[in-house]
C-alpha cells in the first residue's frame, strides 16, 4: 500500500491551530490544485467533539468560500479529518498560508455570529446523513478557541519524517 503524503510528517511536532500545505498538484489540463491541512487541535492531545465538528463542517464550508474564493482560488471541498483534529481543504489555485489563515479567522468570526441552531445550513434529514448530531454551542466553543489561540503555519520541511524514521515505522 503506498504511503500517503499526510503520513510523512511528524504529527508529534505539529502546532495547532495552524495551516499547512499538505499537497500541491497539477491536473492534466494544467490547473493547480492545493490541499491544505487546517489543524484545529494538536494531534494525540485533543480532538474536536463530534457534534461540534459536524456543525462546523456545515458552517465552515460556506464561510471559507465567502472569504477565500476569488482571485484565482476556488474551494473544491472542505472535509473533517477522521482523527477529528482538523479539516482538509482542497482547492483550485495556490493561495499562501497567510491568506488561508486570514480566511479561517474570518470564518470563525462568522461561526460566532450564528445565533440559532435553525440557521445551520442543510440541517435536515434530506440533506444531512446524521442531522440530529449537531451542536451550535460546541461549534462556538471551537471557534472561540481558534480565535483566542491565533492561527499559525506548519511547514512540511520542519515536520518531515526522515527516510530512516519512515523505514522503521513501515518496514
Curated annotation (Swiss-Prot):
<dbReference type="InterPro" id="IPR011249">
    <property type="entry name" value="Metalloenz_LuxS/M16"/>
</dbReference>
<protein>
    <recommendedName>
        <fullName>S-ribosylhomocysteine lyase</fullName>
        <ecNumber>4.4.1.21</ecNumber>
    </recommendedName>
</protein>
<keyword id="KW-0673">Quorum sensing</keyword>
<dbReference type="GO" id="GO:0043768">
    <property type="term" value="F:S-ribosylhomocysteine lyase activity"/>
</dbReference>
<dbReference type="GO" id="GO:0005506">
    <property type="term" value="F:iron ion binding"/>
</dbReference>
<comment type="subunit">
    <text>Homodimer.</text>
</comment>
<dbReference type="Pfam" id="PF02664">
    <property type="entry name" value="LuxS"/>
</dbReference>
<keyword id="KW-0071">Autoinducer synthesis</keyword>
<dbReference type="InterPro" id="IPR037005">
    <property type="entry name" value="LuxS_sf"/>
</dbReference>
<keyword id="KW-0408">Iron</keyword>
<feature type="binding site">
    <location>
        <position position="54"/>
    </location>
    <ligand>
        <name>Fe cation</name>
    </ligand>
</feature>
<feature type="binding site">
    <location>
        <position position="128"/>
    </location>
    <ligand>
        <name>Fe cation</name>
    </ligand>
</feature>
<comment type="similarity">
    <text>Belongs to the LuxS family.</text>
</comment>
<keyword id="KW-0456">Lyase</keyword>
<feature type="binding site">
    <location>
        <position position="58"/>
    </location>
    <ligand>
        <name>Fe cation</name>
    </ligand>
</feature>
<dbReference type="InterPro" id="IPR003815">
    <property type="entry name" value="S-ribosylhomocysteinase"/>
</dbReference>
<comment type="function">
    <text>Involved in the synthesis of autoinducer 2 (AI-2) which is secreted by bacteria and is used to communicate both the cell density and the metabolic potential of the environment. The regulation of gene expression in response to changes in cell density is called quorum sensing. Catalyzes the transformation of S-ribosylhomocysteine (RHC) to homocysteine (HC) and 4,5-dihydroxy-2,3-pentadione (DPD).</text>
</comment>
<keyword id="KW-0479">Metal-binding</keyword>
<dbReference type="GO" id="GO:0009372">
    <property type="term" value="P:quorum sensing"/>
</dbReference>
